[in-house]
Amino acid sequence: MKQQIQLRRREVDETADLPAELPPLLRRLYASRGVRSAQELERSVKGMLPWQQLSGVEKAVEILYNAFREGTRIIVVGDFDADGATSTALSVLAMRSLGCSNIDYLVPNRFEDGYGLSPEVVDQAHARGAQLIVTVDNGISSHAGVEHARSLGIPVIVTDHHLPGETLPAAEAIINPNLRDCNFPSKSLAGVGVAFYLMLALRTFLRDQGWFDERGIAIPNLAELLDLVALGTVADVVPLDANNRILTWQGMSRIRAGKCRPGIKALLEVANRDAQKLAASDLGFALGPRLNAAGRLDDMSVGVALLLCDNIGEARVLANELDALNQTRKEIEQGMQVEALTLWEKLERSRDTLPGGLAMYHPEWHQGVVGILASRIKERFHRPVIAFAPAGDGTLKGSGRSIQGLHMRDALERLDTLYPGMILKFGGHAMAAGLSLEEDKFELFQQRFGELVTEWLDPSLLQGEVVSDGPLSPAEMTMEVAQLLRDAGPWGQMFPEPLFDGHFRLLQQRLVGERHLKVMVEPVGGGPLLDGIAFNVDTALWPDNGVREVQLAYKLDINEFRGNRSLQIIIDNIWPI
């Protein structure tokens, strides 16, 4: 197949006013990621944006204060992903520490209840005695659920970060940084971030009302919950803007110091990660998937129970359960990828005539795993993808993943406007969204989605590209620089881990495992010998003993094994020269 991936180097903003004492490499990396001042590199909690800028907070805390005083039964309604689980656990733990004793939580089941505060979920909350519902990481599109709650006399506070539609649910209070009238500077808070800010505001209000003094309660340190904020923020793949970097760094610092929930400690253990050397990528690729596995295959209540439990023994039992679910998820995903191969082969043959956006469906696909499958197909074909699975009653549930240049939720909203009734419901963000439609509408949707994306997207964006930070000099290929880069994060969505490119002599190459290429390389212009590994290579192409020189896109890394540390490179892309 013709090489579709192009290499592009990041542009560096030469006008960025960064501290002169920063190493030149870091100044270059930060400036190319939109950092323009030292203030944006702040990591202390003092640098956090103030909660006072979130609209709706004052009304929400007043409702919660009255509920606390009157002993009102509060039910927190979460979501079935890692952000929803951490949001739920954080809200319950925070309100307990603030002096609320009559609180419980409910997490919708993906397969039985669907997403959000539906009327059915409201009925479940009502059956459990709910007198006030607080949604976390959902609710902004739950018009019917909020109306049903009102009909039962249950007020609702919505806390969410998903993009709102044209109309808002009739909740008593809504907190969402993406509301049109909200002046909160960061629009990238995860659901757990929104919940954390509400709890900060509530603590201040309770203190000002004399709540803690009246009851002899010590004012809680809510920073103890930042481990949950970090996990939910990274796992939900929201942009790591300056404010989210503070939240994530502070949470990671607590985890590294061993000051985290037993559930997070147990997840680190089953994932074989060293807490003291935690990177943001460990939250995203090791802990997040295990927590998400509960919501994908079973019930996220298991994940919330893990995050709430105070006993490390109990936490280990639950973490092992999640680890087993994650392994099952991997097996299901692998099976779905095998089923998708036939579709992929057809797509490969017709790549030149592929629509801009791909919609795919198989009657045996699992609705808890279609999002991951969509990500895999998107990476392969470099275009927006929505994968569908049967949801029963003649309907399909789809999960979409987009690329830079196409706002997935906006695209679905446009389709819903152009073709009323084709989509049953939808919601999401720029890069990921979910929707439902009737099975007999799939082919129509497939056609219309492909046409819309083709119309909206510049064809150049459909060519995969690797965005590099340029070359490293031989003098920068050291353990010290690798450690500097490790400490310079947290790296993540929209603030990517540094990726470099260069021209190397290929001195050794061999497969390890089934699909991993182990190499030794040397910069063509001279420099250190470097061990490297490329994961999941095309074994039809590699190893190739006829190749003597290669272009690499790589990350500088430290390999730690049995107490020994050595420099290595992690190869993202390898091109023969």
Regions found by a protein language model. Give the residues of each.
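Hydrophobic helix-and-loop "lid/oligomerization" segment in the mid-to-C-terminal part
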Residues: 2, 8-132, 152-153, 204-441, ...
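Acidic-glycine-rich active-site phosphate/pyrophosphate-binding loop
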Residues: 66, 166-176, 264, 521-528
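Mid-to-C-terminal polyanion-binding domains and interfaces
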Residues: 69-70, 314-320, 324-360, 393, ...
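Alpha-helical scaffold elements adjacent to nucleotide-binding pockets in ATP/GTP-utilizing enzyme cores
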Residues: 91, 121, 148, 194-201, ...
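Active-site cavity-forming subdomains of large catalytic enzyme subunits
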Residues: 123-192, 196-216
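A short acidic, amphipathic alpha-helical/loop segment
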Residues: 144-148, 373, 480
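Short alpha-helical basic/polar micro-motif
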Residues: 193, 371, 375, 552
